[in-house]
């Protein structure tokens, strides 16, 4: 009879430990998971990631910077109107800078269309623009007479070449890997939320019932009453 309270204590301890284990299982908060999923989905609905927007801004900067240098070159070589007519209307591959400006326009249109409008997740568009830019500039530097026209004969081809390769590096090493990493994180969070949904809901303290402890003498009294019942019936 003296071992009964110890058994009751062991039972209570077991129930408390099971309760603690259930709480540990529900340490994953589905609300937090859903909040993270909504944040990732909000980025998708936003249409364009922050790093891709930065890339598009740099492409725009490429066009504006080359345009600015070309306008400066037009103004330096005898006025904008006269030089513009000479380079555009009387275009000469060997001495004109107009084709370098058109090359910047070509990069801008292709890259913005591919990575801002179509939201392409492949490198083929940037590979096309960089290859065309590199081949054209190398041919122009070798065949043309730009170096005899002052500093702009060096500046415009070099700047265009560098900007094209910076765009390639930025897309290939920043934009595409970061977006792929964010997509993998979204898949992991969604998978964790699905697993958390399969776990049964946590049990509250009120759902655990612990029977009241009985005194040692109460069972002895019950046994005496059971033994006296046949005598009373006789």
From Swiss-Prot:
The chain crosses the membrane at residues 54-74, 98-118, 123-143, 151-171. Residues 75-97, 144-150 are extracellular. PROSITE patterns: MENTAL. It comes from the Eukaryota. It comes from Homo sapiens (Human). This is STARD3 N-terminal-like protein. Its main location: membrane. One of its GO terms (biological process) is cholesterol transport. The modification N-acetylmethionine is found at residue 1. GO terms for cellular component: cytosol; endoplasmic reticulum-endosome membrane contact site; endosome; intracellular membrane-bounded organelle; late endosome membrane; lysosomal membrane; membrane; organelle membrane contact site. Tethering protein that creates contact site between the endoplasmic reticulum and late endosomes: localizes to late endosome membranes and contacts the endoplasmic reticulum via interaction with VAPA and VAPB. It holds the Pfam family MENTAL. It is a multi-pass membrane protein. Belongs to the STARD3 family. Residues 224-234 have a biased composition (Basic and acidic residues).
């Amino acid at each position: 009879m003296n071992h009964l309270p110890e058994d009751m204590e062991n039972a209570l301890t077991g129930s408390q430990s099971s309760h603690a284990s259930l709480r540990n299982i529900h340490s994953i908060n589905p609300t937090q998971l859903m909040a993270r999923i909504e944040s990732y989905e909000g980025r998708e609905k936003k249409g364009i990631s922050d790093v891709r927007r930065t890339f598009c801004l740099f492409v725009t900067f490429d066009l504006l910077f080359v345009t600015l240098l070309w306008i400066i070159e037009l103004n330096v070589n005898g006025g904008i109107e006269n030089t513009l007519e000479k380079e555009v209307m009387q275009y000469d591959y060997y001495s004109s800078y107009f084709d370098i400006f058109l090359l910047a326009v070509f990069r801008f249109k292709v890259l913005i269309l591919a990575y801002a409008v179509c939201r392409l997740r492949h490198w083929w568009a940037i590979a096309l623009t960089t290859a065309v830019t590199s081949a054209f500039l190398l041919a122009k530097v070798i065949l043309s007479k730009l170096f005899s026209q002052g500093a702009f004969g060096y500046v415009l081809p070099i700047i265009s070449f560098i900007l094209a390769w910076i765009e390639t590096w930025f897309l290939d090493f920043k934009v595409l890997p970061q977006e792929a990493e964010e997509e993998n994180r979204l898949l992991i969070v969604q998978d964790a939320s699905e697993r958390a949904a399969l776990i049964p809901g946590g049990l509250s303290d009120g759902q655990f019932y612990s029977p009241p402890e009985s005194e040692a003498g109460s069972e002895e009294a019950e046994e005496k009453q059971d033994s006296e019942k046949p005598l009373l019936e006789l």
